[in-house]
Structures are given as structure tokens and as C-alpha cells.
Amino acid sequence: MKQEINPKGTNRAIAFELWTKSPMPMVTFTKTFDVTRLCKVSRQRSMKFNMLLCWCIGKAASGIEEFYMLPKNGKLYKYDRMAINVIADNIKGGLSFCDVAVNDDLEAFNANYQQLTETISQTCHDILDDKAVIVGTSAVTGTELDSITNQYSGIFTNPFLAWGRYRKGWFKTTLPISFQFHHAQMDGSHAARFLEELQKTINTI
């Protein structure tokens, strides 16, 4: 459910006033994650690495209140559920998009992820959820990347995570992930907390 709320009645009142009309309100943090555990689970359970990472992102984000508030067109909206936007290659050689509902149950999330990505890949029709707050993702696995920035189009204000190919070392596998967020939605402290929670979730999946 999506509901317009008064920013003055939230903890985002000052930030909303300062940043909602900014020509560039987005901030990007980049953190290098230890994804050794994800690679192990992916192999052992025959689950896609990208799906596992998306599940961890949803798990970490869903526990932070600020993720459920989103500024758009000069207004602030509150949501009661969340989904992860996933991009998939389609049969026409282009890209298609789907929103996978956040779910604490990994098996259920995996089944939904597989069904949605397969459907959009074959039909070339996006499957989107306009009633959920969306956390965008993009896996650019054609190369290793240190950071991905400047994704702001002026239209989409939702949080967005992007990454390249993970890096295998002798003792661990690492992956730099860039996290972009609207400053009216959250402060650096909230973003840092999310990134810490994401690493903890990856470690304990």
C-alpha cells in the first residue's frame, strides 16, 4: 500500500526541506563486501548468486524504517511493503524488469525470483509492482567494477544498488557494491547501517 504523508510529521522533515528540490539529491556509497559465504551457499544449494544477494538486500533493507518512505514529485510517500527490482536479458536481446517481493523465506523468494525472471525473459514484458517501495538493483557482471555512480535520471528516486563481477582471492571472495539513495529519504548514518546489516546478512545466510 502506498500513502502520501506529511514530511513534517516524520524524522525526514528537515532533510525533505533541504533536498527535495535539489538538482542532484542522490548520494552514492561504495563498500567492498566479503561474499565468500554467498558463493558457498550458491554452490551447495544450486541457487543463483544474484538471487541470493537480492534476498540479502531485501532482508537488510526491510528492517530499516527509512526505506519505506520515498520522496517523489515534491511529496513524501510511505509504503507497507517492499520489492527488489531485478533486470534480466530477454529473448529479443534487450532488457526486461521485474519486482520481486521481499520475503523472509529464502525458498519462497527464490521460487518467485525464478518464475518472474523467466517470464520477463521470454515475454519481454515487465512485471512491476507500483504499490511497493522498490529497491533497484543492477548486476553488470561483464567486468570487475570498483564503483558505479551517476545513475540519477531525475525520474526515479528509489534506492539503487549496483555491482560488477566478484573477485576471487586465496582466502575470500569480495564484491564492491555501490548504493545510491535520495538524501531526503535517508541520511548517511541510515545508509551506513544498511550496508553493515547487508554484510551481516550475507555472513549468516
Which residue ranges define each predicted feature?
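Acyl activation and transfer enzymes in specialized metabolism, enriched
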Residues: 40-63, 175-194
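Domain-scale detector for complete catalytic domains at protein termini or as standalone homologs
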Residues: 1-16, 22-24, 37-41, 58, ...
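Small-residue-rich loop/turn and linker elements
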Residues: 67-99, 131
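Helical lid/core segments from catalytic subdomains that handle acyl or acyl-like groups
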Residues: 90-145
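Histidine-centered acyl-transfer/condensation active-site motif
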Residues: 129-144, 159-196
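Gly/Ser/Thr-rich phosphate-binding loops and adjoining beta-strand/alpha-helix segments
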Residues: 5-8, 20-52, 70-82, 135, ...
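Acyl-group handling in specialized metabolite and lipid biosynthesis
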Residues: 26-30, 38-45, 93-107, 186
